[in-house]
Regions:
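Active-site-adjacent betaalpha module
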Residues: 2-21, 57, 69-213
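A short alpha/beta connector and helix-capping loop motif
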Residues: 18-20, 35-63
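Short acidic catalytic loops
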Residues: 21-28
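A cross-domain feature marking catalytic cores of carbohydrate-active enzymes
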Residues: 27, 63-65, 144
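Short acidic, Gly/Ser-rich segments with clustered Asp/Glu that frequently serve as metal-coordination loops
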Residues: 28-34
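Short, well-ordered turn and helix-capping elements at secondary-structure junctions
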Residues: 35, 65-67, 94
């Protein structure tokens, strides 16, 4: 039972802690409250899991909001804000985060070409930066079970448009497994199991039971 030598984490075709950036856009009360394409609670839990995953594996996280400083919108919801409280949050007036100077500079500063993106709504604040990032040579991985739209058809149409442009949809369970990759990498297993336990689906509940004394 021997694992192969770990591939170069910076050049690996799969997502790794050293070649990927996690981007969280517009998880604010107005946006979360207007989601109609999926279960809001599960969506938020999956987004929290995404942030926790990035923290366990020390991946860069870029956080952005829209229209907080103008007074039109509120800040990132507390459940997620608690997890990113030590990180800068780039507030914008642009619906497309890729057209905001500070946000774009923050993404470029990570020097990572694989972008794992969760944003609300799917049909706007996820779709637009995803298309622009693809055009600029980035690989884009929308986290489909951590995002939502104002309707099922709008959400699904936006995902199709991104995929047709070259985006590679993924989900939170797939990401957790892809980033961990090998149970033999024991230093991150406890943190990874903690992320799994917090999701609340069948796998998360099973892990939670196993972790109980």
């Amino acid at each position: 039972m021997s694992s192969l030598t770990i591939r170069d984490q910076k050049t690996d075709d799969l997502l790794t802690p050293e070649n990927s950036t996690v981007i969280i856009i517009d998880y604010q009360a107005t946006q979360v409250g207007s989601i109609e394409s999926t279960d809001k609670y599960r969506m938020v839990q999956n987004t929290i899991a995404l942030v926790k995953l990035a923290k366990v594996f020390k991946m860069p996280i870029v956080v952005s909001t829209v229209n907080v400083k103008t007074g039109i919108n509120g800040p990132t919801i507390p459940q997620i804000a608690h997890e990113v409280k030590d990180l800068p949050s780039y507030d914008r007036t642009t619906i497309n985060a890729w057209e905001d100077k500070e946000f774009l500079e923050a993404v470029k500063a990570t020097k990572r070409k694989k972008l794992i993106i969760a944003a609300l709504w799917t049909e706007a604040c996820l779709l637009f930066p995803a298309l622009d990032a693809l055009k600029d040579g980035y690989e884009v991985y929308p986290v489909v079970d951590a995002v939502g739209g104002t309707s099922v058809v709008a959400h699904e149409a936006a995902l199709r448009r991104m995929e047709n442009a070259g985006a590679q949809p993924t989900g939170i369970m797939s990401l957790i497994c892809e980033i961990q990759r090998d149970w033999g990498r024991g230093e991150t297993v406890p943190g990874m199991l903690g992320v799994l336990a917090g999701i609340g689906n069948g796998v998360g509940l099973s892990v939670g039971y196993r972790q109980e004394p």
